[in-house]
Design a protein with these regions (language model features):
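Flexible mid-to-C-terminal extensions adjoining Fe-S/redox cofactors in radical SAM and related proteins
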Residues: 83-152
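Short, solvent-exposed loop/turn segments at secondary-structure junctions
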Residues: 22, 78-79, 102-104
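Short secondary-structure boundary segments
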Residues: 19, 75, 100
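Active-site oxyanion/phosphate-handling segment shared across diverse enzymes
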Residues: 65-95
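Radical SAM enzyme [4Fe-4S]-AdoMet core and its adjacent flexible, acidic
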Residues: 1-72, 110
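Generic serine detector
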Residues: 2, 10, 56, 75-78, ...
Length: 152
């Protein structure tokens, strides 16, 4: 992790790390899981542990001690961010999914292929946004699609 942070800082780029998300992995995912606090501990010599205001992004940003940038940590399991998440995901097969950790998708592909109007498409997008949860869960639902099938 430190090497990637140094590389990004040398180019004035932002690097973001995401916790392993247990999609279709079964119980062994915990062997590879690294929570945010452990990521911060591994980067303690490079990153100020005081979070910056991240707004509505899933990432929480931390300033580099050398002043040459920031590091983002996306922590859906150890530090859920559902209340401030502004993301939707368009799946590989044409569905709009409001939350990776909840069932429920809105089909866009069929509407687009049928020549739906801009207003009809906007209504479908609003429907998906309305399906975003205010609070999250630490695991995707049983039988959840893999990230490959979701388009991630």
């Amino acid at each position: 992790m430190g090497g990637l942070v140094d590389f990004a800082a040398s180019r004035r780029a932002t690097v973001r790390f995401i916790e392993l998300m247990p999609f279709a992995l079964g119980p062994e995912w915990k062997r590879y899981y690294l929570p945010r606090e452990e990521m911060l501990a591994r980067l303690a010599d490079r990153v100020d542990p005081t979070p910056l205001d991240g707004g509505s992004e899933p990432a929480t940003y931390f300033r580099l001690r050398n002043g040459r940038g920031v590091v983002g940590l996306i922590s859906p399991i150890s530090c859920g961010f559902c209340a401030r998440c502004n993301r939707l995901r368009l799946t590989a097969d044409g569905f709009l999914r409001p939350c990776l950790y909840r069932e429920g998708e809105v089909e866009l592909k069929g509407a687009l292929r049928a020549g739906a109007s801009d207003g009809e498409i906007a209504a479908l997008i609003r429907l998906a946004v309305g399906g975003k949860p205010g609070e999250g869960t630490s695991r995707p639902p049983a039988g959840s699609r893999s990230m490959l099938r979701l388009g991630g």
